[in-house]
């Protein structure tokens, strides 16, 4: 369907001007070309076409706007014409002439004339035929090019372009609407895509520069909108074909986990152990007793050698277990799990210092179970991880802000059920031998299906399986497997596997992975994971059953499946659980339930699909398969599989469904004449067998010639094409984007001009493509078979692409020359997102397999995704390989394809494929090369629509191929010498030719043209021009014995010249280009070549361009590369500095004694002088030699330079020692400065002896001085201070070093209320470690600032790119905002904190520089003038050998190169002191041997790889330099992975003989040899001679005493004088008042220094030091000098190449022995912990919960005692006595604890040593946080004591105690109230009330008591002077507490207890009872005596 608008003319225009038209329909606009100088009438005559996906509604509107075009200002609207399309929809074609309307809707005179046509596919609109349909798409070339590319530079015939036109058109091209994936019909004249698109931009730039007054053209407003949408580089000539399967190859991985601590563990009085599990490996921490917040700091390493897929699916599980011991497995407190892939996808592949949330898998309603703080890192081979510095780490108290969760995952995760519904499977293969089946059949007559399938599902470390369906190829389950896990889960994939149940061993039939990210969306408008019901296809090994299947791994999902195995209908749903629901099952056990069956039609209506293929060429067939006939089989699912299909699917009868009538076929008359009965069309799925013919010694080909065999297959699948169509549209956008980005990268790499314009074009195309997707993707909305995922995914994709289109549009406006690289990075993100979205998780049609078969055996295969072959009439929906000739390289299946076996091409096919509905079959031949006749299987009436079984080509074209093979570089070393004898073999069609063999080189220059004559290509000529066949180039190593060795392969496409084209620029002659050579999946060099395919016209070869090149008579028939293609050469001089050779290994067991170096480049070269005795002095006598050579003008084409070292032996023999190829001379090229440029001497960096220095020429000195004042700042900023100055200006750099006195005066002025921590540290208390820890704080602060600025910048970029987008905030941004808010809250001190916790001021301590990496990486390997070249010998190893280049290194050549054009400018040689013998290497030192004192300081090691079974190591240092070998075995550190060594070693060495220092860390073993953990190597010689002065670091300040004493034997003034002398710099001139002038720079600084006695004396050292610290600002010779530092070096183990085994912190000082001797080494021995004693008096408790019920009275009471410890419960637990029977919760103790401990103040850790177990050889040192634990318990006599509550006080920062029990609240401990924090190390004595907490049943904290305690800290000396007794003992005893009498034991004094128990409680009741008793007694007596008295009374007695 399409709407076509033909805009003819616009008339009645006023005035004269440039006009442009804009035509808009459905939001997509096209612009016409600009018509210049139109007066009255504008004759556009342009056609615009909109392919439309859905029918046009009669109410839709077409809008046309006419503008006056302005090249500078915005365009001015003339008028608008809007047309409702009602009539167009009814009549198909409408011609219109009408007037326009202006802005105010008034009619104006101007009128337009146009024609509108509408093509509807269903034929409902007017009469039309196929001609209409095709013809309109292929209008004549000019119109079509105007429509799509009319405004794109380079897209029009160059004859029509003038400079002015080019300028206007290019400026306007931003608005050109590129239609995505537009391919022209083959009938039209093709557009010249290869023409360089930049050629026509020159006029634009010229004009822009005039406009902008010499500004950069891209800063001018018009130029800044210029966009290029056609390729500039020739990337298309380099097809990217990967031969070797990369998936499934095992790799080395290391998972390292540090468990630091746990907090808030739920439970009372726990003994927690942390279990760390990766896959099936488990490791445990030590047990911590009776604590809810244990501290571990234990490091675990897990090593794996598996494929990436297996690795990333492994689950990391961190569990906390309570009371685990040898007998008990312990009870699980909680666990946390995450897959390895989630960790690997994090920045730096790690989580650092994050808190894992624990939850109980057995009780999902239980909530949070605690937190574990840990570091998790996953390292693959070669990964470089930046680990944050380990030392002096502070506690991250903000748990919520540092959770172990990926970005965007909410901290509150909910429990959810994952329902995996398994419905049924189809097409299962036979999984049993048929022998028994045949016996059964013979006896019983049964023929059973030979498979017993069931489905197993793996998710998040759990697995569940369905029931087994016995003997069924089409099993029906209708079951669901239910998993319960937290949502969102931290496991990315779910594995679904069909398995065959077997008595012995169940085997996998097929595996499918469900990526949860692809079936859900976590955005604001996202959706929960959902899938299906949908079919998923499973692939694996071939279907023939064998008992031992060598490809069984493929069925397990490892590697690419080579055959269709089965398809499974499944569904997935997620339900978030309400954990408060009491009916909910709380277990997370996997359950299997019955699922509701679904109807067959729910996955879509079954449709008949038709697959057609034509084999146009089969070449490069491996010679192993050349002796038997070969056939090719094509299968789709089980259809077409004739050999082992076995359970062939039955053809389903088409079912009529309601709505079928509406789905009229897209092309009405496509297959009317085909019958519908079964069997009307038998499938032909394989080609007839044919015996191959020989091509050359390696390969064969099948002689198809003009008869091309065809295959066709009918198959039936649910019609879910819409899914594939949408995926294809996105793939097209992504392909276009990738091509564009590659083009931009190539432009940047090859330094082509204006990459920013090309990037704008790329973004423009992306924006249009996204818009196109929105209009096309929303079809077929009402289909009943659409699943929920289909609907949600579509919405999600539409939102993403709409957003991406808008971002691309806004990003396009921001692309400038200086931002190209940044924006390119953002565009790469777009590409990743598009590829992710295009991957459809719900399969429909299975992939197509092409198998090469010989003798009925499957040999090699290729797999093509069905979506790539799917036909659609909408261009964007068409599969990228549908109806196209595709080149396929067949490969061996499974593991056979790994390694050298996979390097050989098994076969190369040129194959045409088409897949579509049978109804659309009319189009299946439309893309084939024209000129064929069809051969049918049967002849007769009504069979004309039958597909052909072969095609006979009658049209063929004659061509000649010229392969210009110039040179190759960095080839694979195939011989044991480390060199090769390479030749290249070029394959094209069925021919091959070889270049000559060049001996012993890795960089051959063949300079040879290979001519392939008599090439016959079938098809239309112009089709071959657009898409020529692929050329294969293979590089081999010629062996005198045996066959040639394969070295690598590359692919190319030739530039095609048709007979009617002129052989002239810009397309011809072709340019030489580099092609990447691959050997398997590894790169193996580059080939510099060009290829052209020339059509031979009617007059034969006479029309071809002549072969003219430099004829070399010596080369005989070999033709060189012709002039015009070969590079233009210029004369260059190559100067070589020969310094020396190092570490040469033996050759053939003989030592190298008299080596020589040969240098060769482009056939010319030079030899070094001979080293007469390598052992005595390995340096050369003659330092500099040179030779002249002709090199290409284009630096990218420079040939490599070869360095070879030979050993000269007796009788004139010499043997090769090793060689090195410098593949790029670029870094050694010297460019004379352009003195005409302003500020040339600051902007140009010169190469002096290959050391780039600023060149300072004669310069006029300005009169004014620039004063740069360097005020003292925060230490953080101090390190960053740089003074950037112009080299010609004078400057005063004022450096004020803060003087002690000023500081002291300031301190004195401070009031007494100031906090003690702000005091100036006492100089005598400071040591080197103070300096070290202060420096680490600074480094961390800098890193934090750097990260913050980095994230701010990224956010800013994201904001910019998303500018103008109105939409909800993404969840990622929300979570980030929440985290920031939380951080702010935590950082801001509360009102109550006041002076207690202000922002900690830094003490004034001098610092050094801590480098988190090697010093070499900071200073360019110290190769400022002396370079090191590794000499290699031996064959290059392959990946699977695990070999590295290290093993091939046989020595090193030290020297340098300088390459420059001759002649040099005279002023260079005229410079002062120029010595012609040294050429460009002026001022280099002598290379005579020199004696040096090397002093190595080893500070500490971190994260060492465990070497012992217990997961620890006993490390010690070993140092080797020359013959000196030091092993510090005695001082090994027991059971430590983070040892602090603090050692220095002095070694006397002689350079150059002893220059490679090796520092290793070994593991001490009691028995057996010690194991190497890792080592690092340092080249001392490069450091010694470097201009960066790496001998002894320059300190920050100059001191003559104290901890910061100056280490260098030379003072700063002496160093400065020497540097000035060596660099021939004027100075230093010291002046009064602390001034020094060096060259034209003046530095100022303090002029006095204080000695040890406090005496001040004048000095120039401070100011000299300030000059040294800014030496890089000195003109011409300035460079950064190495500061005083500590470097961090990775430790590597040769047995585990590429994986770090830990890191070592050290630094090296070197002092020449002929200079003054240095002072004593610095003392960096580890700080000894200081001995302290903590005295804790427990006075009272209050409000303690009452646990016991009284036996007699039922009254609540508690028998209270208090327990406390500091180091650990086993080590120093102390209990008070028991306060019995407390009725009020009050307890009185007056009890003293004494805790002696050793404390490291710098690390805030207690140090303790103890044996790890009874079997340990020695004590292990532990560092634990200084935390005092106080607990209250209820004592029980017979049962275990009951735990009531606890508080843990961090002695460095704990809440100040409340003055009274009433003021003491629970919030003090939970941190909800701002309480002043105190440190016992500062306060020394603290007394107060503290709350004691425990968790209740709801897992919430509750107050269980209060304790009054007094803490008193004393040093060991003070404690000795004032001793006190433990408990209430002497000396200084505490008085006994005055406890109430209730607090005794009742059975010792029952009367007393009765008195207390009864009288105190019930006295009033007792009194009432007594009174009542007396009254009753009285009444009883009265009654008793009443009768007597009455009788007496009556009787009167």
From Swiss-Prot:
SMART domains: C2, FerB, FerI. Ca(2+) 3 binds at residues 1508, 1514, 1563, 1565. The chain crosses the membrane at residues 1964-1984. One of its GO terms (molecular function) is calcium ion binding. Disruption phenotype: Mice lacking Otof display hearing loss. Both outer hair cells (OHCs) and the afferent auditory pathway are functional. Despite normal inner hair cells (IHCs) and ribbon synapse ultrastructures, these mice exhibit an almost complete abolition of IHC synaptic exocytosis in response to cell depolarization. Binds Ca(2+). The ions are bound to the C2 1 domain. Residues 659-679, 1314-1325, 1352-1361 have a biased composition (Acidic residues). It is found in: Cytoplasmic vesicle, Secretory vesicle, Synaptic vesicle membrane; Basolateral cell membrane; Endoplasmic reticulum membrane; Golgi apparatus membrane. Ca(2+) 2 binds at residues 975, 1037, 1039, 1045. Ca(2+) 4 binds at residues 1508, 1563, 1565, 1571. Residues 1985-1997 are extracellular. Residues 1370-1383 have a biased composition (Basic and acidic residues). One of its GO terms (cellular component) is endoplasmic reticulum membrane. Residues 791-820 form a coiled coil. Ca(2+) 5 binds at residues 1836, 1839, 1842. It is a single-pass type II membrane protein. Its cofactor is Ca(2+). The keyword Repeat applies. The keyword Transmembrane helix applies. Residues 1-1963 are cytoplasmic. GO terms for biological process: sensory perception of sound; startle response; synaptic vesicle exocytosis; synaptic vesicle priming. Residues 1-98, 235-356, 399-530, 943-1068, 1115-1241, 1464-1593, 1714-1865 form the C2 domain. PANTHER family: FER-1-LIKE, OTOFERLIN. Interacts with SNAP25; the interaction is direct. Interacts with STX1; the interaction is direct. Interacts with RAB8B. The N-terminal first 124 residues can be classified as C2 domain, based on their 3D-structure. They are not sufficient for calcium ion or phospholipid binding. This is Otoferlin. It comes from Mus musculus (Mouse).
